[in-house]
């Protein structure tokens, strides 16, 4: 393959990639900030015991949390499911610890569904959350929160 053909292939590939990225961004870009805000409403609501923020983040009608837990009697791992309405109630008071969160990835599909990967750190535990959201009539709401937690030494 000569240099001109190689350059043409490279330019065509770059143009295709740039066009695909630009198109995808314009389709979901207007919703990106709303999805980010919903994820941080959850995080800030939990950290600050702010039920109003949690209500803005969670779909209390259909939402659930799934988590790995260990059965105290058998010692076996199990998957526990808790309605988001109940889960929100766990955060009635602000934490005295410093919590931090970083969004690792956002995937938005047709401005109707989104998934956010959230790196969530507290002094005692490190979490990775996957937040699945639907855009409802009242905005973006978390309908499924799945996470793993690792206790720190």
What are these model-predicted stretches?
Residues 64-77:
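A short gly/proline-enriched turn/hairpin at secondary-structure junctions
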Residues 58-61, 69, 119-122, 131-132, ...:
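A mature extracytoplasmic/lumenal domain signature
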Residues 5, 19-52, 56, 60:
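Short, low-complexity N-terminal intrinsically disordered segments enriched in polar/charged residues
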Residues 1-10:
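Bacterial N-terminal signal peptides that target proteins for export
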Residues 76-125:
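Surface-exposed, charged secondary-structure patches
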């Amino acid at each position: 393959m000569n240099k001109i053909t190689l350059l043409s292939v490279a330019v065509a590939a770059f143009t295709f990639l740039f066009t695909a990225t630009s198109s995808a961004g314009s389709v979901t870009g207007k919703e990106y900030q709303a999805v980010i805000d919903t994820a941080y409403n959850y995080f800030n609501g939990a950290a600050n015991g702010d039920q109003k923020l949690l209500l803005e983040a969670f779909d209390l009608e259909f939402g659930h949390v799934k988590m790995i837990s260990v059965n105290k009697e058998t010692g076996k791992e199990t998957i526990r499911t808790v309605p988001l309405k109940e889960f929100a109630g766990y955060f009635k008071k602000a934490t005295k610890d410093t919590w931090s969160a970083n969004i690792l990835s956002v995937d938005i599909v047709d401005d109707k569904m989104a998934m956010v990967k959230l790196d969530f750190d507290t002094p005692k535990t490190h979490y990775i959350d996957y937040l699945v959201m639907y855009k409802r009539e009242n905005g973006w709401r978390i309908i499924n929160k799945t996470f793993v937690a690792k206790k720190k030494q």
